[in-house]
């Protein structure tokens, strides 16, 4: 599934569901198009609010909601327009729906436009 925003930006998850075992390393990938201000990852547990994980920039750098969380990181491949979320040494508590999102670059200042983030999701399931 692809989500296209009003600025011609799209973001697409590469696989919808990942089946992993505890202790595995997992990389989730989304591809995007267009000029972006930043790329974000969110997590959502069943019947819970969306939880911000981190934000990355095409030019490098970014920020995490919890800087001490060393098992989660992101990487952006600007040339190929890929954004990755990496989870190291997964735990059962990592089972959730993960959303990749982008904020398009806007040439004129309009506060409401920055609220229109485009999102797509991955589902992380654990198997025996």
Predicted regions: what is each one?
Residues 1-128:
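Extracellular domains of the immunoglobulin superfamily
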